[in-house]
Amino acid sequence: MKVRVGFGYDVHALVPERDLWLGGVKIEHTMGLQGHSDADVLIHAICDALLGAANMRDIGYHFPDTAGEYKDIDSKILLFDTMELLRDAGYTLGLTLIHISEPTRPLYISYA
């Protein structure tokens, strides 16, 4: 079995008047992430890691922020399309490990 490893990294600024999406889940918060799509940094990083492992460039190449069709798109669609690209190229996903960090501005989320 051949193993390939990819690393994904994504950053978006926290801004008011945007929804906050992480991993396809809407998080109740006063701020959201700025971006052309829904700005889900977690899914974007996963897409980059998968595409990188397959040597298929990056998310910006396949889903450019200059294309109107991706304006405010649900990033789960981008992940689905990324997985289709990988399957079409003969790849399967074995394992995904995820680390989320926000070093400059703590993101406090409480669950009651």
For the regions a language model picked out, list residue spans one by one.
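Short amphipathic
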Residues: V3-D10
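Acidic-glycine-rich active-site phosphate/pyrophosphate-binding loop
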Residues: V11-K26
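Histidine-centered active-site/metal-ligand motif
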Residues: H12, H36, H44, H99
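A short glycine/serine-rich beta->alpha loop
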Residues: I27-S37, D65-Y70
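A generic structural signal for residues located within well-ordered alpha-helices
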Residues: S37-D38, L42, D74
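Active-site His/Glu-centered metal-binding helix of metallohydrolases
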Residues: L42, I46, L50
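Glycine- and Gly-Pro-enriched alpha-helical subdomains that act as flexible
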Residues: A49-G94
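Single conserved hydrophobic/aromatic residue that forms the stacking wall/gate
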Residues: I98-A112
